[in-house]
Amino acid sequence: MSYTLDSLGNPSAYRRVTETRSSFSRISGSPSSGFRSQSWSRGSPSTVSSSYKRSALAPRLTYSSAMLSSAESSLDFSQSSSLLDGGSGPGGDYKLSRSNEKEQIQGLNDRFAGYIEKVHYLEQQNKEIEAEIQALRQKQASHAQLGDAYDQEIRELRATLEMVNHEKAQVQLDSDHLEEDIHRLKERFEEEARLRDDTEAAIRALRKDIEESSLVKVELDKKVQSLQDEVAFLRSNHEEEVADLLAQIQASHITVERKDYLKTDISTALKEIRSQLESHSDQNMHQAEEWFKCRYAKLTEAAEQNKEAIRSAKEEIAEYRRQLQSKSIELESVRGTKESLERQLSDIEERHNHDLSSYQDTIQQLENELRGTKWEMARHLREYQDLLNVKMALDIEIAAYRKLLEGEETRFSTFAGSITGPLYTHRQPSIAISSKIQKTKVEAPKLKVQHKFVEEIIEETKVEDEKSEMEEALTAITEELAVSVKEEVKEEEAEEKEEKEEAEEEVVAAKKSPVKATAPELKEEEGEKEEEEGQEEEEEEEEAAKSDQAEEGGSEKEGSSEKEEGEQEEEGETEAEGEGEEAAAEAKEEKKMEEKAEEVAPKEELAAEAKVEKPEKAKSPVAKSPTTKSPTAKSPEAKSPEAKSPTAKSPTAKSPVAKSPTAKSPEAKSPEAKSPTAKSPTAKSPAAKSPAPKSPVEEVKPKAEAGAEKGEQKEKVEEEKKEAKESPKEEKAEKKEEKPKDVPEKKKAESPVKAESPVKEEVPAKPVKVSPEKEAKEEEKPQEKEKEKEKVEEVGGKEEGGLKESRKEDIAINGEVEGKEEEQETKEKGSGGEEEKGVVTNGLDVSPGDEKKGGDKSEEKVVVTKMVEKITSEGGDGATKYITKSVTVTQKVEEHEETFEEKLVSTKKVEKVTSHAIVKEVTQSD
């Protein structure tokens, strides 16, 4: 561990002294200093280094360039020792070494004073930052008081609003009661009007009857009058005749006598006639009266009957009208009640929505404040960590100077004895310093653990923000997709998913925090890699660009490989009897590889397995097709883990239809949990057993197998054309997700284009020297972490049941299965009887056994060969294009004497890529 000399001006003054110690020669201008004071923020590379640069102005003004030049010329121990060797005599050498020692002590004292001033300045700056934190806390407290006051006012206003609403409802009820009274009065008025109309109608009917009876009476009166006139006429005629007869009789006596006799007869006759006529007239009158009375009685009876019927009909009509009015009144009252209830409901809904929005705003504000507080805490932890690193560096240098002073004292005491004594004392402190540097390098990861978890919390908060921003769009799209999915698939798979997902989610939730604790270490090593391997990173970016082009060109091939893998997995249970022994052998080999390779993150694998099982269940039955019965499905190459693409269970392949839009939205299973960055290079112990670097001859043998598999691959392409067209959007999302991976990681995990490609890759290992203390400490870590992993695997074994293939695919996601298969094939074909077990850490083989082979000087060669086979199928004419690209990267690393270089290839974790993957999943759902 070293400390930056940028504040003292030119760093070459100290670099020349510490050429033999490579760990002291780092400059703080890069994003990661010697003690790994790397920034966590994505915007600025290093906040702490910038603060040191600002603080460096004061020490620069204090010390002059002459002092620096004197320190520059006096700190070279090798030059002083050579001067001691080549001096003319013991007295002159002693004086020269004495003056040089004084200058060295002067320079060291000046530097130590500069360090002390820098420490004082940093303490003062820490106090200022604490004062700012206190002010911010007081400001937040004042904001909280204002919020309480506003809440009180809002509560009062809501209480008044409730009172006003209550009064309004009371007035509304009063108005409803008044309306009911008005309706009742109107009903009574209408009923009285109806009664009046009925009486008037009865009066009119009686008047009509009176008129009819009067008409009949008039007719009868006319008949009586005519009969009386006739009787009078007949009587007058009769009297005239009688008078004529009497006149004739009076003419003669005889006649008179005869006339008298006749007269008596006539009078009697007249009397008889009169009596007869009267009797006839009376009889006629009597008959007429009887007929009239009979007729009148019949009419009156008919009128009475009709009146009763009319009255009953009128009563029924009136009753119906009353019922209709009562029902209409009830309907109006119910309608008014309904309207009032609807208004109250709308008011309550508006109030609820307003409260909900206010609560959401408050929650958002609190989340933002919490996020800001977390960032502040992370920043303060970073500063605290950097100060601890500075303190440790100062303690180391103070101890080194103390050793130097003790060595000088012993040299002065033994100077009279021999001239070789000072040479030994000069070399002894350097050895002690280098050993301490190695120890501090080994102990450095322990200090990093303090701020790893804080950074992961911040990243998790960002993922939740992305989830909250896209929640509405995702829920709408999942609802639309839920309509289009068949109901039978839902009924068959719903019960199995609910039972298994509950147990899986519990395990994932329980193991989530230790998984994420390893992620931030990648960013520190990423910065360290950018400083140490600039040239190698440019070559890797070129390879990544080429692999991305190959991925885009082979999107159809990727989709077909995903479909076929899904079919093989779904029919894996039915073929379990035939393939049981092979699956058991593969499972044992996987466990061995996991125990050696996954030492830091065993729990993360279980979380990834739990998440891999879910998309396997969520796959629709469309994937069941006879293509799994192809000859390649049972060939040795098809059963190798290479045939199972690491992207076959990518997070974008999940079907959000079978799950509720809210409880199991695709964000809940964020690809960040499965991100390959969790497999940091430091997770794999350099002390593990590793094979020797593989010769290029072993690379050629898997390529020879590629030609044999190409013939079988052509047969698959025709069957997979239709299936490949259905999943282009999933492939784009998978490409987006794999872009942040570095090139050596891609060679192990394989891009989606290589999912069905017969081409296999060999990543030769590069031995890197590791100090014995580091090896001893890192050998203890796998034993503890293997115990934790066994406990986690026991819990995961109950959840997985019989799904062994999902475990294989999970290992393939982390980029391990393919490396294992390559090692097995090279053992069988190239190595013969040798049995080698090792862990390839992102293309680097850390083999401590090779440290002593080269002696003081060793040369290491890394040859990385990548072959990408792109198969493009055109749907129109059925033509198929085969494009093969190969990229070879060769690098040599030389090591001298006690120096060692640790080349670690770390994966880049970019959260923007994760969010893009989610967006592509949304377009796929559309």
Curated annotation (Swiss-Prot):
Residues 512-698 are annotated as: 17 X 5 AA approximate tandem repeats of K-S-P-[TVEA]-[AKETP]. Residues 2-104 are annotated as: Head. Phosphorylated on a number of serine residues in the repeated K-S-P tripeptide motif. Phosphorylation of NFH may result in the formation of interfilament cross-links that are important in the maintenance of axonal caliber. Phosphorylation seems to play a major role in the functioning of the larger neurofilament polypeptides (NF-M and NF-H), the levels of phosphorylation being altered developmentally and coincidentally with a change in the neurofilament function. The modification N-acetylserine is found at residue 2. Residues 544-563, 585-619, 696-764, 771-811, 826-838, 849-860 have a biased composition (Basic and acidic residues). It is found in: Cytoplasm, Cytoskeleton; Cell projection, Axon. GO terms for molecular function: structural constituent of cytoskeleton. The modification Phosphotyrosine is found at residue 320. Residues 101-412 form the IF rod domain. Residues 21-44, 673-692 have a biased composition (Low complexity). The modification Phosphoserine is found at residues 30, 99, 226, 346, 418, 430, 468, 484, 513, 547, 555, 560-561, 630, 635, 640, 650, 655, 665, 670, 680, 685, 690, 695, 727, 751, 757, 771, 831, 847. Belongs to the intermediate filament family. Neurofilaments usually contain three intermediate filament proteins: NEFL, NEFM, and NEFH which are involved in the maintenance of neuronal caliber. May additionally cooperate with the neuronal intermediate filament proteins PRPH and INA to form neuronal filamentous networks. This is Neurofilament medium polypeptide. It comes from Bos taurus (Bovine).
